[in-house]
Amino acid sequence: MDKGIIVSCQAEEGSYLNNIQSIVALAKEAERGGAVAVRIEGVDNISAVKKEVDIPVIGLIKKKYTTGKVWITPSILEAKLIEAAGADYIAADATGRKDALTVKDGWKNLRDICELTSVPVIGDMAYGLSWPYE
């Protein structure tokens, strides 16, 4: 991937932009504006954007759990769906959380995705004020 800006083209649930046409339009505008890649959520969006842009697509699937926590591509199942949709890269969660996967589990998930897909993997990590997790 070239050096430059990567634009995340996503819309929250309930947003009037949360539809394939809007996500494709956002990605095309990001490319027109000079983005070197776009970050796209959801298999249908990934597939549609891949057909319309000539820059790399970083694919992810957000899974919201009953705890309210959101995980980015939390398992090989989602990673395989992203790969099949044509993403150039897979973004996967490696964030440690007390109530879910540990950092070690996150890294294992990343390794598994790397080994079982043919697409480069980008680790998504975020930490709040309660770091370090024990």
Model regions and ranges:
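Alpha/beta enzyme core
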Residues: 1-134
